[in-house]
């Protein structure tokens, strides 16, 4: 097959991975993709707010152990390189098992050290369930998220919020920079010592070396013998019946 792919396939597509670069999708639709190298030009042309006010990672998508570990690798760099995070930053783990395991392995510590706030393992900012800190809930502004939807008003009820979708590690980098036009591949940041530093490519672990762990999985096993269990339902209940 590898020696003569055209014999087995109708079409052969070759992708040069060295030419790929991070993208941001949005605003107002996940279908509008812009590579980070072109974001400055697009933002200026379209009048998108360049300041990143909030970075949001997690939810039911892009919140696996590997996702969190890659975001944490960027956070660890910010700590080591003395970079101050310029935007509000929240983390929503994908499950209690993921949360417990990334806490055990130190990833949440790194994310919290840069100012990250860990939210509940549930629907949150993705569908507007959060207390956003803002001095004007109706102003034109930009946020970046690793969620899979960014339609108008979805995240905070404000039709002027420009939400851009990216990978958790890119969201983290942009929260550190506070700038939508920041290109982590080519651009440097100034740390608290006044030094110019660059972020290294993220790293992560596909699976935890010590395995997954959870203290309370939220599951209660049924009784071995349920014949003596009585379920009480009001005789006049209009919602439940046996």
Question: Predicted regions: what is each one?
Answer:
Residues 208-237:
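Long, charge-rich low-complexity segments
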């Amino acid at each position: 097959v590898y020696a003569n792919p055209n014999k087995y396939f109708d079409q052969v597509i070759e992708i040069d991975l060295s030419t790929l670069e991070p993208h941001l999708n949005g605003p107002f639709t996940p279908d509008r993709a812009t590579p980070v190298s072109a974001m400055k030009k697009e933002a200026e042309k379209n009048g998108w707010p360049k300041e990143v006010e909030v970075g949001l990672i997690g939810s039911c998508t892009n919140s696996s152990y590997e996702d969190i570990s890659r975001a944490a690798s960027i956070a660890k760099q910010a700590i080591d390189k003395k970079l101050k995070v310029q935007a509000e930053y929240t983390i929503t783990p994908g499950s209690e098992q993921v949360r417990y395991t990334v806490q055990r392995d130190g990833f949440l510590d790194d994310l919290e050290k840069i100012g990250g706030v860990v939210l509940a393992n549930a629907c949150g900012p993705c569908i507007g369930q959060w207390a956003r800190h803002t001095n004007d809930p109706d102003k034109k502004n930009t946020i970046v998220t690793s969620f899979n939807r960014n339609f108008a008003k979805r995240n905070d009820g404000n039709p002027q919020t420009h939400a851009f979708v990216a990978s958790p590690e890119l969201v983290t980098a942009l929260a550190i920079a506070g700038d939508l036009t920041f290109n982590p591949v080519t651009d440097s940041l100034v740390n608290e010592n006044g030094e110019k530093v660059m972020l290294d490519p993220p790293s992560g672990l596909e699976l935890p070396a010590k395995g997954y762990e959870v203290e309370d999985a939220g599951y209660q096993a049924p009784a071995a013998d349920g014949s003596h269990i009585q379920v009480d339902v009001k005789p006049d209940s209009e919602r439940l019946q046996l």
